Regions:
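N-terminal pilin/flagellin-like segments and related low-complexity appendage regions
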Residues: 33-285
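N-terminal single-pass transmembrane signal-anchor helix
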Residues: 4-35
Length: 285
């Protein structure tokens, strides 16, 4: 070795190894969080894709699709010449022509293996039809948009979105100030509710002990036994759903990170957007 050349000392090598170890540990610690953020970005993209398909379906057919159920093979259950058999259920992927990760019941799954929930309004303006305005052929056009009394709209979805719920008040928003969309208290907003709602119950969906606002989104009235479905597992699993017929028409959407680990993703479309798209397509006057 040339006496003029110097190498790293053991202390210098040890310091470098320590720094590398710290950086690797930091990276490894961040990976689960980065993976979770990616999953939520994937959820947002997929839900936006589903909503676009639902609005496109309405532009073509003049109505909203009914939800699918576990044994309907990804096809809407009812709708068209008759109203939906169930107004709460799952994304009708085959009716909408969507692709994605499905389980054995042909239900579209979020990144955590839970089917996206899809709820469509069963509201019926008193036009003599006696069927849901948003899901039966010709009903939306027959009912029309304009009314002379508040909320100045005859086509009126009943879903209310808020950022704080109250199970003790029959599944409604805690107060007018927390309403994000809708007019359950009659104190604001031109519409009484959204025509449809799409939900992912998030990473903690399999926690049967869900409470508070997450329980509002899952369903205060248990319409089925809660058997967490296994992705690509046996068909016929039971799922928990809100019961619209029991008045469960409120959904909660707020940021994650609260003490109760709220992580649901809730999306809907304003009637302004839905109706304008349908007018453009000639489906509404």
């Amino acid at each position: 070795m040339n006496p003029g050349q110097k190498g790293f000392t053991l202390i210098e090598i040890a310091i470098v190894l320590l720094i590398v170890t710290i950086l690797l540990g930091y990276t490894v610690a961040l990976f689960p969080r980065q993976q979770e953020l990616k999953q939520y970005r994937d959820v947002e993209r997929k839900m936006d894709e589903v909503i676009a398909a639902i609005v496109g379906f309405a532009q073509v057919n003049g109505r909203l699709p009914c939800p699918a159920i576990p044994n309907s093979a990804g096809i809407e259950d009812g709708g068209g010449v008759a109203e939906c058999n169930n107004f709460g259920g799952f994304v009708p992927v085959n009716t909408l022509g969507l692709s994605g990760r499905l389980n054995a019941d042909s239900l579209l799954l979020d990144p955590w293996g839970n089917p996206y929930r899809y709820y469509v309004s069963s509201s019926d303006f008193d036009d003599g039809g006696g069927v849901g305005d948003f899901v039966v052929n010709g009903e939306m056009q027959q009912v029309g948009l304009v009314s002379t009394v508040p909320p100045y709209l005859d086509l009126d979805g009943q879903f209310i979105i808020c950022d704080l719920g109250d199970l003790t008040l029959n599944d409604i928003c805690d107060a007018p100030a927390v309403e994000i969309f809708g007019n359950a208290f009659g104190a604001g907003g031109p519409y009484a509710g959204a025509p449809f709602v799409l939900i992912s119950h998030g990473k903690n969906w399999s926690d049967a002990a869900a409470a508070g606002d997450e329980l509002i989104n899952m369903g205060a009235t248990l319409t089925t036994a809660f058997v967490p479905p296994i992705p690509n597992g046996p068909a016929g699993s039971a799922y928990l759903l809100k019961d619209e017929s029991a008045g469960e028409t409120t959904f909660v959407r707020r940021i994650t990170g609260f003490a109760d680990d709220f992580d649901d993703v809730v999306k809907w479309v304003s009637p302004n957007i839905l109706f304008s798209k349908m007018i453009e397509a000639g489906q509404l006057p």
